[in-house]
């Protein structure tokens, strides 16, 4: 698939125990269905040719012979299909019986992977029938008339990705084989399983899959036995999970009475980028001496981008189910960061410029929470509203109402006269509303805040957010500067949700109403005079673009290192019906240009707590101020 995605499938057929022909027929139909959906790799449950619950029938030669014949038929039946298939079979070898995964494609068996860890406790008795891979030396084995490699450390490469296979209990071991496979280069791990269900076990299993996927920085595709297996003592729910670097992207229905196939796309490009960034991953390779063998599959032609997985248009914003948890955690990080800075500096007051906008509102709320935690009087928070040429009644009123309801000290200082004097001093026409006109107001406000902080042994609390820093939407040495920036790692789309979350937790109805009105106010620096009706004329998103788009671009550039081409393709999916292609391209180009040419502002940022992604020059993002954006802009032009 295009853009580094690999389409995979976790298949759960309805088996008949010991009826190999039936089971092979089921799998042939599902492989054909997978091919029609452009699936590149499909996995079936453990011992799927025979069924897992054959018990002592595994010792019967008639079953083992029929299993191999059915596998041979399946390989031949699907030889015209490019799909790589992974099926389970009991495989006789050198007087032992191996619980094996067979990997095949286009009529050729690529390799046999033996199960390493055989459970032999509680309801499991696998050592009664099978030998472990630990007892089976690496070798070439005969199966279905083909001579193929058999070993536990085996990688398969397709041209689009490299993958490995482990079987059921392997995942539950202290150090799963997939850990070594990942270190050797496996980007996706496939697990064929026979996990029976007990109360509470599924939740544990899901977490196990997610954790192993995250720890290995890999995709993890899990397929477990389902309907048709014997229920003499246990029940198999037919669990299917597709996990991408710790996040479940697709999950099949459990306890279904018919066969099911779960399809999803693993973002291999993102996995590769994460492994490059995480240098600990590379260092871990030195902890083991096992060497995997690599088997080449037939190259597969990438299909067009047709994702079954969703693309989140608001990647920074927690889902509704997690909103309380994450908002509380974010707010606590901001509060604790500021509290430590006050404890260290022994500053007596916090000085904040309050505009009636989202960012200064969140900064004020953080300061209030910090002072409450430190048992300091809220009156030592000095909120300064500084009306200018573009201040509207709505933001001015909200600023005053908010400060009053929170019980902080209120100061009002108009910057109009000082700016007019400044324009006279430098010879600037007050009617020319250019960058000088705008930036002089921002710098005048910052000067006032700094001087008040000096007067009151205070600390100026920065209000700028991550999105503004990415775009350089701040006046250099104006609102760009502070003594501690509590919002520096919080993107604009998240600021809005945080303020709304805090508002809904307040008992004070006046404060709550004010906060919710601030959330609904158009984003603006208010540096240009209002329109004739007194409404905001200078709207930020009309100038630099929608913050929903910019935060989407920022997340995918910083978190995944994606190219403009891939970001554009994902944005088309995420914002389908909301923004057309021309709009997305326009603002993506703007983002790339501004992200590069505004780096000089980020190179001298004040301190501030990391929340998630960060552009701090001392931490997450070390970029030269004079780097060129040519490569990124050239790609934007070709979109």
What positions do the PLM features span?
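ATP/NTP-dependent adenylation/nucleotidyl-transfer catalytic domains that generate, transfer
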Residues: 7, 23, 159, 216-218, ...
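Enzyme catalytic cores with a strong preference for nitrogen-chemistry domains
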Residues: 1-351, 369-378, 410
């Amino acid at each position: 698939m295009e853009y580094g995605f690999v389409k995979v499938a976790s298949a759960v057929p309805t088996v008949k125990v010991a009826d190999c022909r039936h089971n092979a027929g089921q799998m042939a139909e599902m492989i054909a269905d997978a091919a029609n959906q452009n699936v590149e790799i499909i996995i079936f449950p453990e011992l799927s040719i025979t069924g897992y619950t054959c018990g002592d029938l595994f010792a019967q030669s008639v079953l083992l012979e029929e299993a191999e014949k059915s596998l041979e038929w399946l390989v031949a039946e699907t030889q015209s299909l490019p799909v790589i298939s992974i099926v389970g079979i009991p495989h006789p070898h050198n007087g032992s019986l191996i619980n094996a995964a067979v990997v095949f494609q286009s009529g050729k068996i690529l390799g046999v992977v033996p199960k390493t860890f055989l459970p032999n406790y509680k309801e499991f008795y696998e050592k009664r029938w099978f030998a472990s891979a630990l007892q089976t030396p690496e070798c070439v084995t005969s199966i279905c008339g083909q001579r193929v490699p058999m070993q536990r450390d085996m990688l398969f490469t397709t041209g689009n990705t490299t993958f490995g296979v482990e079987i059921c209990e392997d995942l539950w071991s202290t150090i799963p084989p997939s850990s070594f496979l990942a270190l050797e280069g496996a980007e996706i791990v496939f697990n064929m399983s026979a996990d029976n269900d007990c109360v509470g076990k599924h939740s544990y299993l899901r977490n196990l899959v997610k954790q192993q996927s995250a720890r290995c920085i890999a995709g993890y595709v899990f397929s477990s036995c389902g309907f048709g297996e014997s229920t003499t003592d246990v029940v198999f729910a037919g669990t299917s999970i597709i996990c991408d670097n710790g996040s479940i992207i697709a999950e099949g229905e459990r306890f279904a009475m018919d066969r099911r196939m779960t399809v999803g796309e693993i973002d291999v490009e993102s996995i590769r980028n994460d492994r490059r960034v995480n240098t600990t991953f590379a260092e871990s390779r030195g902890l083991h001496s096992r060497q995997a063998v690599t088997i080449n599959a037939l190259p597969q032609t990438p299909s067009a981008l047709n994702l079954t997985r969703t693309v989140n248009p608001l990647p920074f914003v927690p889902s509704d189910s997690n909103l309380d948890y994450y908002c509380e955690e974010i707010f606590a990080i901001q509060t604790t960061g500021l509290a430590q800075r006050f404890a260290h500096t022994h500053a007596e007051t916090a000085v904040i410029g309050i505009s009636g906008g989202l960012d200064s509102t969140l900064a004020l709320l953080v300061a209030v929470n910090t002072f409450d935690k430190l048992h300091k009087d809220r009156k030592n928070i000095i909120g300064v509203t500084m009306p200018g040429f573009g201040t509207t009644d709505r933001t001015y009123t909200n600023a005053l109402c908010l400060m009053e309801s929170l019980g902080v000290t209120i100061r009002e200082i108009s910057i109009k006269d000082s700016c007019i004097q400044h324009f006279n001093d430098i010879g600037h026409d007050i009617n020319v509303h250019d960058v000088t006109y705008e930036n002089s107001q921002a710098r005048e406000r910052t000067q006032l805040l700094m001087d008040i902080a000096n007067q009151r042994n205070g600390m100026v609390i920065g209000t700028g957010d991550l999105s503004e820093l990415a775009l350089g939407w701040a006046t250099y040495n104006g609102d760009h500067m502070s003594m501690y920036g509590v919002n520096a790692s919080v993107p604009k789309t998240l600021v809005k949700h945080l303020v709304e979350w805090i508002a809904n937790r307040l008992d004070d109805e006046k404060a709550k109403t004010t906060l919710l009105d601030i959330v609904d106010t158009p984003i603006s620096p208010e540096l240009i005079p209002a329109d004739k009706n007194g409404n905001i004329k200078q709207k930020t998103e009309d100038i630099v673009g929608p913050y929903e788009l910019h935060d989407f671009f920022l997340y995918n550039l910083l978190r995944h290192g994606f190219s403009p081409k891939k970001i554009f393709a994902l944005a088309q999916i995420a914002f389908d019906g909301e923004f057309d292609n021309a709009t997305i391209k326009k603002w993506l180009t703007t983002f790339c240009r501004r992200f590069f040419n505004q780096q000089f502002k980020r190179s001298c940022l004040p301190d501030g707590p990391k929340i998630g992604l960060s552009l701090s020059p001392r931490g997450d993002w070390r970029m030269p101020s004079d780097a060129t954006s040519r490569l990124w802009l050239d790609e934007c032009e070709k979109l």
